[in-house]
């Protein structure tokens, strides 16, 4: 329903426009005589008759001595809401100005004609947009505008439609259409400034004793001409600006200031030239870019200059030169900014150089990156050093056991009896580690030959000299440390091995910390020192049982390098030697104790 209501109102409004009777409108004739040598504008005011104006604007009448504050419609909110039409010469319905004439602009109740031409001639009607009462139907103004070019060429010094006033001095504003007539011949003139009536001024010139900023604006001068048949109003529009005196200085370049500019090779670059030009009435600024290479110099085609700031006294103009990519060749050139006005010219050259900070930054970042990489690699190397060494041994190292005249890769020593409660379960005791896990991993998996007294020596025990002999014939000594071990007779084996290692550089000792223990005061000084300096591998219970655990990797790291492919033959050879040594031992032990001697 709302849409239907709007459509109905639009149709009614359209019928009113089509059937709009302009016979009741007040009529005013205007003449616009324009010069073909200059650009000028023209304005029409919607000047309603006084009775209708007071009804439409709801304003109080002024006494004859009072001067209206504003030109009709310019100061009234109601009068700003008017509609302009043009009446075609062929009698067609009225045309909306806003839709059909782009060179005509409506500003409140004023029509601005931007370009002169005889095609602007015609009848223009203005009326209120909102018709609130039957009286408003006849509230309209019809203006008959005649436009023709100026034909009087006898006036050589006619006033311009654009006039300047010098600030701080005296000046005058002349009506262009009457500038060639003397004051005695000139008719009475009505002046308007920015839509306000200047009631005091009636001559063809406005004399200004001292020019200020507020004298700038749009002035309109009207006077009446008549003949025996009719009379009309001649109107001219003057654009007045207040200016300062022409500059006496050359333009100065604000940017670039320095004669060198650091750049990055391979990157795009924009060099800006900003220049400040002093005011000139005839303002023709010049700003260009040149390139100087050795003895050659040429102008560069760059984008158009643009004004970035304009004041009463000066204007700042900018023009840029754009390089898609900075090359080594550009570093050998000079880029010259050239600016000029009517007084003189100024130049500023710029030499490009490679940015040192970027190079240093790259070096610094590269150094830091290298340092971080080295630290990370060092940490990784430290963490996996054992695995790396073992991998290297597998493929590169030669067998260290060849030709050393030793029968065992390692002699294993552990506590054979227990006087302290074990911290481990029976399945993970020292004996289980020595007699079960060591053979399974070191012998069966990696091919090392071990000497285990409980396994490889015939029952009945061995003497101290026999243990020393076995250690001498071993490349490594493995000692499983525990409270039972350091407080029991097995510590003799460690002491003997330490003494032998001092003389035999091929004998290496490996300590296994099976569980926590305290060193007894009775330990020999040499053993105490050995506990601190010898390599120690910590047993971590069930975590160390798998053959691929770090415990076994550390054990292999300390074991001699051995070619595992030939371990079967070596084991057979070593086993036969052990049995030969056992038989010899039985025949030579008559009358000797089976217990190790006191140390």
From Swiss-Prot:
Catalytic activity, reaction form: NAD(+) + H2O = ADP-D-ribose + nicotinamide + H(+)
Signal peptide extent: 1-19
Enzyme class: hydrolase
Effect of residue 210 to A: Decreases binding to the preformed binary complex of IL18 and IL18R1. Impairs IL18 receptor signaling via NF-kappa-B
Tissue specificity note: Detected in adrenal gland, bone marrow, brain, fetal brain, fetal liver, heart, kidney, lung, liver, peripheral blood leukocytes, placenta, prostate, salivary gland, skeletal muscle, spinal cord, testis, thymus, thyroid, trachea and uterus. Strongly expressed in peripheral blood leukocytes and spleen and, to a lesser extent, in colon. Specifically coexpressed with IL18R1 in T-helper 1 (Th1)cells.
EC number: 3.2.2.6
BP terms from Gene Ontology: adaptive immune response; cell population proliferation; cellular response to hydrogen peroxide; immune response; inflammatory response; interleukin-18-mediated signaling pathway; neutrophil activation; positive regulation of natural killer cell mediated cytotoxicity
TM region positions: 357-377
Segments on the Extracellular face: 20-356
Catalytic residues in the record: 493
Reported modifications of this chain: N-glycosylated.
Sorted UniProt keywords: Cell membrane, Disulfide bond, Glycoprotein, Hydrolase, Immunoglobulin domain, Inflammatory response, Membrane, NAD, Receptor, Repeat, Signal, Transmembrane, Transmembrane helix
Glycosylation sites: 21, 119, 152, 345
Gene Ontology, cellular component aspect: cell surface; interleukin-18 receptor complex; plasma membrane
Domain free text: The TIR domain mediates NAD(+) hydrolase (NADase) activity. Self-association of TIR domains is required for NADase activity.
Subunit structure: Forms a ternary complex with IL18 and IL18R1. Within this complex, IL18R1 is involved in ligand-binding and IL18RAP in signaling leading to NF-kappa-B and JNK activation.
Protein's UniProt name: Interleukin-18 receptor accessory protein
